[in-house]
């Protein structure tokens, strides 16, 4: 039986590779990204195996809505990959308060919101 994956940050890098690997083994994927244009081509390439959704993981309401839409479309979710995130590079004393807050919003709260949304 194939699995249904929910992958954040699927527009590039590891997220995109996770999508391609899951589809290659016969699974279906909800591919999310802040900019939906970054994942639409995956649906074109893989057809019904990929549902592209726009999702800014820092928006708790959007995370709940995306999970609801994904579940309505595929009937369930089996695997969640909280891949959306980014790093800050450079001297720590040069990181601004806003940069730190943005990183915490995505890398910590984004994971929390998506995980809470998929739990029963």
Mark where each language-model region is.
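Conserved hydrophobic beta-strands of the Rossmann-like cofactor-binding core
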Residues: 4-7, 80-81
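Conserved glycine-rich cofactor-binding loop
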Residues: 11-12
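Conserved glycine-rich Rossmann-like NAD(P)H-binding loop of the short-chain dehydrogenase/reductase
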Residues: 25-41
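A glycine-rich helix->loop->beta "capping" turn
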Residues: 48, 69-82, 88
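The beta1-alpha1 cofactor-binding region of Rossmann-like NAD(H)/NADP(H)-dependent oxidoreductases
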Residues: 55-65, 97
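Hydrophobic positions on the long internal alpha-helix
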Residues: 66, 81, 114-118
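Substrate-binding pocket helix/loop in short-chain dehydrogenase/reductase
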Residues: 91-92, 96-101
